[in-house]
Amino acid sequence: MKKILIFIDWYTPAFKAGGPISSIYNLTHFLEEEINFYIVTSNKDLNSKKELHGIKTNAWQQINKSKVIYLDERSQNQKMLRKIINEIKPDKIYL
């Protein structure tokens, strides 16, 4: 199966950013039987200082059939993003 790596500022259970969160969630849910999705996002909601409830920070976890990593601010850097890309070896990257 093809691998797609998605970088998005906020992802479920975040909700304050609205449409983009829903769009990526629906895209991955609709195509999860055909594509392996890996999502890199932040561990806070839009304009929030609190970590999202119910997530693990800086660790991959399963949301439906997608793998998601919620990064804290310290881990949102070029070195970490390069490490993730090299680890996943995606067929495509969605920015």
Predicted regions mapped to residue ranges:
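Conserved donor sugar-nucleotide recognition element shared by glycan-biosynthetic enzymes
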Residues: 20, 77-78
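Conserved nucleotide-sugar phosphate-binding/catalytic loop shared by glycosyltransferases and other
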Residues: 47-76
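A short alpha-helix capping/helix-coil boundary motif
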Residues: 5-8, 60-62, 86-88
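N-terminal subdomain of nucleotide-sugar transferases
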Residues: 1-53
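Short N-terminal targeting/anchoring amphipathic segment
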Residues: 83-95
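Alpha-helical elements of Rossmann-like donor-binding domains used by nucleotide-donor carbohydrate transfer enzymes
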Residues: 26, 80-83
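Charged, low-complexity C-terminal accessory regions
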Residues: 71-74, 80-81, 95
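Glycine-rich loops and low-complexity Gly/Arg-rich segments
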Residues: 28-33, 61-66, 91-94
